[in-house]
């Protein structure tokens, strides 16, 4: 061993040369050295670990580590038997190969340094590879975050934008359709109403389909919860039309119930007023047939009489509804009747003292409807003798009477079959509309309406030039239309009929008067005078023949 050590420590010049030669030899020496005591150095050139090989290196190191250790231990046991044998082999090696021995020691040191560097390089490569993997994972997560935290693709976003554009377009179209619907209300235009309604329904269906499309888009990219929400939404969408139909049916049921109550009231009034008038009804029906056959030819007194009967029926119906509203509002009906009688007496020119002496209990409670009907008829027939009910100063009937009569009869034929509510919806400010507004405001004053309905909403609409679509106002329009048609017929006839009204306290004349109260034997007892007039009468003259429509009066015993 000592000669080998001495031979290895030569002069510096030779030592530097040896280092260079050793560096060259290291590049050509084999890679794997089994143990440091080996004599020959037969190895492959050293290799640097690549990043792609690190994974294979780690996997092999785990699986084959134990096997390699066992193999090397067996080889060591075979090669080295004892410590003395080892010393002899090393000494022989130094004597036989003095230069290679020094090179071997240097190579061993170099190899240890190289192994250390290689391990460090491998560790650095592993660290760099792990950093690269982390960076790649971070980039993937960033890309996923940019694409959408919920996994929304670019195509889905574009489709969402298209859906939103369609939603805004549908909303704008629905707004235009709603404006058209409002314009069709005032003035009332059924065709425009139908078109606007169809447009509104179409746009609503379009928005509903867009909503379902949006829900399907959300359901495809989400979990079961959104699918369940979409299912519930589709169920609500399917049930919604049926719920709307049920609501409409409920409204119709309420309307029908109200109509039934009104018809019951009409039947009650008709049965009380016409208890034994079966024969009279047959005569009226025959008159109605005759009038309908002659309506398109020319105005005749029979047509006027038939229209007057319609006025009586309409006034009874409206009076019954108004009286029921008063009772529902807990009015003092007796006080209201006294107030009506006082107003009737003052219009007839009676003094308050003379009226007060006879007004006590003159009208029983069951006859209060006659006093209320008297009040209504007096208000609505006021100004009947003028061609426009004194709403303006027109004198067309005097300037061109023949043309005016033809125009009035043409208006009568046009208006007879029309619904007054629809007519006023189309032409709210026509002459008939102005007549309805004026008469309603004179019959139903503000305090009365507030007491009956709790507010004055209908009155405010009428003052503004509109016409409410309520049941009460509809009943009033029925009476107003009947009086307006009677007025048109009156100015269509030549000569025009003259109307008259019985004064309070006047004696009863069966030729000109008709009692609203039915007596037991069908005849009016002696000593009855007019308590107050209920409805005016008319005197007709046509082609030398005259007829009279009797005035309806409420009779009381002479005081």
Curated annotation (Swiss-Prot):
Disruption phenotype: Maintenance of negative gravitropic hypocotyls grow after exposure of seedlings to red (R) or far red (FR) light. Reduced seedlings viability. Residues 107-127 are annotated as: Disordered. GO terms for biological process: negative gravitropism; response to red or far red light. Transmembrane segments: none annotated. InterPro entries: DUF641_pln, GIL1-like, GIL1_IRKI_C. Residues 114-127 have a biased composition (Acidic residues). PANTHER family: PROTEIN GRAVITROPIC IN THE LIGHT 1 (PTHR31161). Required for red (R) and far red (FR) light-induced and phytochrome-mediated deregulation of negative gravitropism leading to randomization of hypocotyl growth orientation. This is Protein GRAVITROPIC IN THE LIGHT 1. The gene is GIL1.
């Amino acid at each position: 061993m000592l000669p080998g050590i001495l031979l290895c420590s030569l002069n510096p010049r030779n030592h530097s040369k040896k280092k260079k030669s050793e560096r060259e030899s290291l590049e050509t020496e084999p890679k794997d050295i089994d143990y440091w005591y080996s004599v020959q150095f037969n190895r492959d050139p050293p290799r640097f670990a690549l990043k792609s090989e690190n994974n294979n290196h780690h996997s092999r190191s785990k699986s084959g580590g134990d096997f390699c250790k066992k193999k090397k231990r067996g080889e060591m046991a075979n090669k080295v038997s004892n410590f003395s044998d080892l010393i002899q082999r090393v000494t022989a090696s130094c004597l036989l190969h003095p230069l290679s021995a020094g090179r071997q020691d240097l190579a061993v040191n170099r190899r240890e340094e190289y192994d250390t560097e290689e391990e460090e390089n491998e560790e650095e490569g592993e660290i760099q590879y792990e950093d690269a993997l982390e960076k790649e994972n971070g980039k993937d997560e960033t890309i996923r975050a940019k694409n959408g935290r919920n996994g929304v693709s670019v195509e889905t976003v574009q489709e969402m934008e298209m859906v939103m554009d369609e939603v805004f377009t549908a909303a704008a179209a629905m707004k235009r359709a709603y404006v058209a619907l409002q314009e069709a209300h005032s003035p009332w235009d059924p065709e425009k109403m139908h078109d606007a309604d169809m447009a509104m329904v179409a746009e609503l269906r379009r928005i509903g389909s867009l909503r379902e499309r949006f829900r399907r888009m959300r359901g495809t990219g989400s979990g079961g919860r959104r699918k369940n929400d979409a299912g519930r939404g589709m169920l609500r969408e399917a049930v919604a039309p049926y719920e709307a139909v049920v609501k409409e049916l409920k409204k119709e049921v309420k309307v029908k119930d109200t109509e039934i109550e009104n018809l019951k009231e009409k039947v009650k009034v008709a049965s009380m007023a016409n208890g034994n008038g079966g024969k009279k009804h047959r005569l009226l029906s025959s008159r109605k047939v005759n009038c309908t056959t002659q309506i398109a030819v020319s105005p005749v007194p029979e047509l006027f009489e038939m229209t007057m009967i319609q006025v009586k029926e309409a006034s009874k119906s409206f009076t019954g509804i108004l009286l029921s509203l008063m009772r529902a509002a807990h009015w003092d009906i007796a006080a209201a009747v006294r107030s009506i009688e006082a107003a009737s007496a003052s219009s007839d020119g009676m003094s308050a003292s003379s009226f007060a002496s006879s007004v006590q209990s003159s009208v029983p409670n069951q006859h209060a409807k006659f006093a209320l009907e008297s009040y209504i008829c007096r208000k609505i027939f006021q100004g009947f003798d003028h061609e426009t009910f004194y709403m303006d100063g027109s004198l067309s009937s005097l300037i061109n009477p023949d043309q005016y009569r033809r125009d009035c009869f043409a208006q009568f034929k046009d208006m007879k079959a029309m619904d007054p509510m629809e007519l006023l919806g189309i032409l709210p400010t026509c002459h008939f509309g102005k007549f309805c507004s004026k008469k309603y405001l004179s019959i139903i004053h503000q305090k009365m309406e507030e007491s009956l309905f709790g507010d004055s909403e209908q009155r405010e609409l009428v003052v503004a030039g509109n016409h409410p679509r309520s049941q009460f106002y509809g009943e009033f329009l029925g009476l107003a239309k009947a009086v307006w048609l009677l007025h048109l017929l009156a100015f269509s006839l030549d000569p025009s009929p003259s109307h008259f009204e019985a004064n309070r306290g006047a004696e009863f004349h069966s030729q000109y008067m008709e009692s609203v109260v039915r007596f037991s034997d069908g005849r009016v007892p002696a000593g009855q005078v007019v308590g107050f007039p209920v409805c005016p009468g008319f005197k007709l003259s046509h082609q030398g023949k005259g007829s009279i429509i009797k005035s309806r009066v409420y009779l009381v015993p002479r005081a």
